[in-house]
Amino acid sequence: MTNIRKTHPLAKIINNSLIDLPAPSNISAWWNFGSLLGICLILQILTGLFLAMHYTSDTTTAFSSVAHICRDVNYGWIIRYMHANGASMFFICLFLHVGRGLYYGSYMFPETWNIGIILLFAVMATAFMGYVLPWGQMSFWGATVITNLLSAIPYIGTNLVEWIWGGFSVDKATLTRFFAFHFILPFIISALVAVHLLFLHETGSNNPSGIPSNSDNIPFHPYYTIKDILGVLSLVSVLMVLVLFSPDLLGDPDNYTPANPLNTPPHIKPEWYFLFAYAILRSIPNKLGGVLALVLSILVLAVIPLLHTSKQRSMMFRPLSQCLFWLLVADLLTLTWIGGQPVEHPFIIIGQLASILYFMLLLVLMPIASIIENNLLKW
């Protein structure tokens, strides 16, 4: 008798994507992050669901309801901090996942890559709206500053901002709709993840060498299920150390002050995972230019497949490109640091140079390095 997992309509889908999936025999730990992102998403949806049971999306009670969750709800504090720090873990995995794709040329699967970019935007939007919900000072002013950026759009900008606000400032209507969007988006993300995997399983996974692995595939289970469990245990360990020992390490103290429209915090800054984009935004003295640079800092990923000039897919055997890749990593860390600093000398010029270098590396230097490497192969 044929195994039921191979014949049952539902079990067959799970079997083909998690059990009998042919996977390259040489994929490294860098390929763990896809499953880790799935775990993060499930964790965020579950903790978020329990938080939503006790949260009220009203300007007068939002801040108090979060305090109530932490003080009065059974294990509310751990659910709240797992949700807040789970977002940080989510973004760490996201950045590493995208970095892996850049390094090993996974962007040569265009559908998978483009849906990944849409997913990145969706997760960033969800995280931004979630940060507004506790209705602390940084929530309120972050929402005000970021939504205000849309007013830079010519002609329709001001109307668009007021439409998003549901009034003439960030208020009750804004908070309510942000809660609604923050609740629905993770389910949209889940659907996009399914499409992301659908396209990935059409081609099969890439591998570190960048060479087709059709002649040397192994079943996903038990090899990579066991390998993924190690990644999951590591992720959960780091998350729980963060949650149980220093839950506010990555947060902003200003968010423990209730939102006050009459008092602006000295330094308005987003969560750490948006600081690189915030630094790029601030490095341009023009409002519209800054907004465009902010969007392009992520959207630039979409043109990377078009700029692939190398004869090899992966950077594994391309030392020049490797140097530029790690320079890009250092540049992003610099931008993250600058994003959290006040707008004054010398941070302004460092931010501007780091922003120029970011776009130069991705759009100019890396394609040129690939051409040089192609020519070196002829020697």
Swiss-Prot record:
Q: List the membrane topology term(s).
A: Multi-pass membrane protein
Where a ubiquinone binds, per the record, is at: 201
Q: Which domain of life is it from?
A: Eukaryota
* GO term, biological process aspect, one: mitochondrial electron transport, ubiquinol to cytochrome c
* Primary localisation category: mitochondrion
Keyword Lyase carried by entry: no
| Gene Ontology molecular function: any one | ubiquinol-cytochrome-c reductase activity
SUPFAM superfamilies tied to this protein: a domain/subunit of cytochrome bc1 complex (Ubiquinol-cytochrome c reductase) (SSF81648), Transmembrane di-heme cytochromes (SSF81342)
For this chain's record, the cofactor binding note is: Binds 2 heme b groups non-covalently.
Residues that coordinate or bind heme b b566? 97, 196
Q: What are the protein's UniProt keywords?
A: Electron transport, Heme, Iron, Membrane, Metal-binding, Mitochondrion, Mitochondrion inner membrane, Respiratory chain, Transmembrane, Transmembrane helix, Transport, Ubiquinone
GO CC, sorted alphabetically, is: mitochondrial inner membrane; respiratory chain complex III
- Alphabetized InterPro entries for the sequence: Cyt_b/b6_C, Cyt_b/b6_C_sf, Cyt_b/b6_N, Cytb/b6-like_sf, Cytochrome_b, Cytochrome_b_C_euk/bac, Cytochrome_b_N_euk/bac, Di-haem_cyt_TM
Location(s) in or outside the cell = Mitochondrion inner membrane
Could you list the residue ranges that cross the membrane? 33-53, 77-98, 113-133, 178-198, 226-246, 288-308, 320-340, 347-367
**Cofactor dependency:** heme b
Positions binding heme b b562 in this chain are: 83, 182
Q: What else is known?
A: Heme 1 (or BL or b562) is low-potential and absorbs at about 562 nm, and heme 2 (or BH or b566) is high-potential and absorbs at about 566 nm.
| Function description | Component of the ubiquinol-cytochrome c reductase complex (complex III or cytochrome b-c1 complex) that is part of the mitochondrial respiratory chain. The b-c1 complex mediates electron transfer from ubiquinol to cytochrome c. Contributes to the generation of a proton gradient across the mitochondrial membrane that is then used for ATP synthesis.
Indicate the quaternary assembly. Answer: The cytochrome bc1 complex contains 11 subunits: 3 respiratory subunits (MT-CYB, CYC1 and UQCRFS1), 2 core proteins (UQCRC1 and UQCRC2) and 6 low-molecular weight proteins (UQCRH/QCR6, UQCRB/QCR7, UQCRQ/QCR8, UQCR10/QCR9, UQCR11/QCR10 and a cleavage product of UQCRFS1). This cytochrome bc1 complex then forms a dimer.
Similarity annotation: Belongs to the cytochrome b family.
- This protein is called what? Cytochrome b
